[in-house]
Amino acid sequence: MQTDAVVLDVDGVLVDVADSYRRAVVESVDRVYGRTVPVEALQAFKDAGGFNNDWELTYAVALYVLAQREGLKIPTEEFAAHVAERGGGLDAAQSVVADMPSISQARVRDKWDRDRLREVFQALYLGSDRYRDFEGGDPPFETEGFIHDEPVILTEETAANLTDRFDVGVLTGRPSAEADVALDRVGLDVSDEHRFTMDDWEEGKPHPSALMTLAERFEAETVTFVGDTLDDIRTATNAAEADPSRSYHGVGVLTGGLTGEEGRKKYEAAGAAAVADSVNDLPALLE
């Protein structure tokens, strides 16, 4: 596959976040509401689209848990399917809950505390020291932080190969400070102008604007975007539709929530140009 520039997602591509971000989602809801969903259930929300921001994923899971308390009788996968039918993301999750009886809706809304959920999420993920550094205050409780439980996927050899052969950028839903931690850990030096984080754009994936901007900055005719979710592939296909002057390839990796043959089929159905076992297969895939 020919390309001029390679743009990398972080979570599930450069580092494994199964025991960090995803764990923080389910445990945040459990701490605040005393019940949650299995971590495996999160993939259905991710597949629904619109949950590149894990805070919003946490809020949606909390909505589902609260709705269950008020009489919602559908499994997680069915709830996520309804979310997908309504366009994905947090607004769609709220729309599904809005189909409940008005009294039940009101009870859910009264108990749904996004500020508290975010506070707990950040404390669990960052740990006490980084919470004070990044959030500018004391955490709600003391903890070491799941951020330390992110095994590196990208090898030094792969990083050197990609940066020697191509322009390399980063496009992630992480806040900037948290992206810095991951990039430092994998030893990937990417300038500010060649990366987009949660802090740099409002739309989030799968909106193509950030990927298109990186293509412009690289002056690249062909861009390959590597991610671990269907929204990453949709970002590339949306960019190809919005910017026909360039070619955009979406490559899915099987080191995130999508794995095995089922994950491969989902990527292909979403329009992936290729599916790789991991980011470390990219050097052989790209020309």
Task: Annotate each PLM feature.
Residues 171-224, 229-241:
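Substrate-recognition "cap/lid" segment bordering the active-site pocket of phosphatases
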Residues 1-50, 56-59, 63-68:
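Active-site neighborhood of HAD-like aspartate-dependent phosphohydrolases
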Residues 226-274:
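Acidic, Mg2+-coordinating phosphoryl-transfer loop and its flanking beta/alpha structural elements
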Residues 49-149:
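A metal-dependent, Asp-based hydrolase signature
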Residues 166-170, 222, 271-272:
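Short active-site oxyanion
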Residues 188-199, 262-287:
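Structural recognition of alpha->loop->beta junctions
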Residues 25, 134-141, 146-184, 198:
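Substrate-recognition element of Asp-dependent hydrolases with the DxDx(T/V) motif
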Residues 1, 162-166, 217-221:
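Glycine-rich phosphate-binding loop signature in dinucleotide/nucleotide-binding domains
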